[in-house]
């Protein structure tokens, strides 16, 4: 039987493999519960592609775990939530993205946890909320909501009002990701604000379909407005 260290090496070899399509399939040859730890480590990797492949891998592994034993998958989801809690002492890098990816691939987990993901971008005047103040974490939450919206727009729709506020954020990546999410939700009430961003040439990076690409807020705003019909 492979040791935890051996499995971590195997997981990272797959995440770093030039043939990632094949690597994804090989993840299932490993004991899934022992894959989870290395995947959490991958979310902090200095190589952005390894981090994003880790996110993708979570979306493969945890739904498979849920189908076999729902409580084991819930434990993983609760670990993400704890990592984003101030009391955890950690940062929670990659946690919102992984949550969104998992929920896009498993309806029951999405039903249980989508509101938690959406509330990460909801700020109240009292401050009694789970709003993520760190812009990089908030980017992750908006990307996660956009990924959820790709598969389950009706669940992501609860974030519509907060996403419209994000369209005015000073962070260009947040503005672009909000457009992506709102377009997928088909949020007609966001049309006028997104139309204002059609001339926003700010550059940003976007992960999707297994690749990191460069795009602009303008491109994402234009696509989102077009999606509204």
Where is each model-derived feature located?
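Histidine/lysine/aspartate-rich catalytic loop segments that bind and position anionic ligands
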Residues: 114-152
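Hydrophobic/aromatic-rich structural module bridging two neighboring secondary-structure elements via a short loop
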Residues: 69-100
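Short coil/turn segments at helix-helix junctions and helix-capping linkers
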Residues: 41-49, 82, 86-90, 165-173
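Conserved hydrophobic register position within alpha-solenoid helical repeats
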Residues: 23, 54, 95, 141, ...
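Structural signature of alpha-helical solenoid repeat scaffolds
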Residues: 59-62, 100-101, 142, 146-147, ...
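Amphipathic alpha-helical scaffolding segments comprising HEAT/armadillo-like alpha-solenoid repeats
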Residues: 2-9, 30-42, 64-81, 108-124, ...
